[in-house]
Amino acid sequence: MPTIQQLVRKGRESFADKSKSPALNSCPQRRGVCVRVYTTTPKKPNSAMRKVARVRLTNSKEVNAYIPGEGHNLQEHSIVLVRGGRVKDLPGVRYHIVRGTLDTAGVNGRTQRRSKYGAKRPKPGQAPAAKGKK
């Protein structure tokens, strides 16, 4: 344990917080190109086919990014906008793709939380879009 005199001379060393999305280089979002679009399964208690894309960012780093919402139009060479935010049950996926920007279409038929999924406001008086897959 240091003496008060040692603390006066040297002080305590403070540790800087580590970034949770280091590939973005302190930027809120980054543009990138899809290298591979695929599905993967989540960790143990959960079961699904989660849609994920491998994206090469403009700073030439490659990351795995989650594609939120139901259905998407992404394929290889699509230009996407990537934001931070991990997916808890997918190890190694620490980024999200922003829906409704660049080559990524918004989610069709979405009426609630539309801004999160890039969905346009439905016309007033219009019948709600059909739910489910046909």
Curated annotation (Swiss-Prot):
Region called Disordered, residue ranges: 1-26, 103-134
Compositional bias annotation for Basic residues: 111-123
Compositionally biased spans, kind Low complexity: 124-134
Sequence ranges of Basic and acidic residues compositional bias: 10-20
SUPFAM superfamilies, A to Z: Nucleic acid-binding proteins
Pfam families (UniProt xref): Ribosom_S12_S23
Signal peptide positions on this chain: none
InterPro entries named among the record's database cross-references: NA-bd_OB-fold (IPR012340), Ribosomal_uS12 (IPR006032), Ribosomal_uS12_bac (IPR005679)
Gene Ontology cellular-component terms listed: small ribosomal subunit
GO process annotations (BP): translation
Post-translational modification 3-methylthioaspartic acid, affected residues: D89
Keyword tags: Methylation, Ribonucleoprotein, Ribosomal protein, RNA-binding, rRNA-binding, tRNA-binding
Source organism, top-level taxon: Bacteria
NCBIfam families per the UniProt record, alphabetical: rpsL_bact
Family statement: Belongs to the universal ribosomal protein uS12 family.
PANTHER family: 30S RIBOSOMAL PROTEIN S12 FAMILY MEMBER
Main function: With S4 and S5 plays an important role in translational accuracy. Interacts with and stabilizes bases of the 16S rRNA that are involved in tRNA selection in the A site and with the mRNA backbone. Located at the interface of the 30S and 50S subunits, it traverses the body of the 30S subunit contacting proteins on the other side and probably holding the rRNA structure together. The combined cluster of proteins S8, S12 and S17 appears to hold together the shoulder and platform of the 30S subunit.
HAMAP family: Ribosomal_uS12_B
Protein name from the UniProt record: Small ribosomal subunit protein uS12
Organism: Porphyromonas gingivalis (strain ATCC BAA-308 / W83)
